[in-house]
Amino acid sequence: MNVEVAKARIGDVPAVVALVGRYARRGEVLPRPPENVYETLREWVVAKQDGELIGCGSLVILWADLAEIRSLVVVPEVQGVGVGRQIVCGLLAEAGRLEVPHVFALTRKPGFFAKLGFDRVARESLPRKIWKDCMHCTKFTGCDEVAVIRAVSSTAASMMGRAIADVCVR
């Protein structure tokens, strides 16, 4: 499978909105309206096969020491073949380039993230996320997502024994 993972462009926005919307309608991710994707376009990475969008995700910087992977989705037809891994690796590389030491995600698929060097943590250990976003979510008191985090900076990653190259070699 020949998949290209790259930073999103203006022309990708309608497909990103449609794909994320597909999963949002099922309650798997939060919706991202077009204006939100346009405003945050530089945060997005897309995966394409033969020019067609097959997956996407975004990296949101929350503070100097922390970023979040959001809206990670892959079309069902190519799930399980490494597209999600490639998107996450692209987002981790961007976090590394920006020198953000840690990246987290809230997910219903912690096993996927564990294979990429993420560890489970209590949501309460992410107070910036809780106060900024979670407090306003309709699922706040009954959240079914698991918080996972991993070190990105070479120093932090080596302390955890998980360099990005160890999990992102293609």
Question: How would you label these PLM feature ranges?
Answer:
Residues 1-31, 46-48, 145-147, 154-170:
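Short amphipathic alpha-helix that is part of the acyltransferase structural core
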Residues 3-4, 97-103:
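Short active-site oxyanion
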Residues 36-49, 68, 141-144:
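A short helix-loop-beta-strand connector motif used in the catalytic cores of GNAT acetyltransferases and
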Residues 46, 52-61, 65-73:
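Conserved beta-strand in the GNAT
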Residues 74, 80-95, 105:
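Conserved acetyl-CoA-binding loop-helix of GNAT-fold acetyltransferases
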Residues 131-145:
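Cysteine-cluster motifs in flexible loop/terminal segments that predominantly coordinate metals
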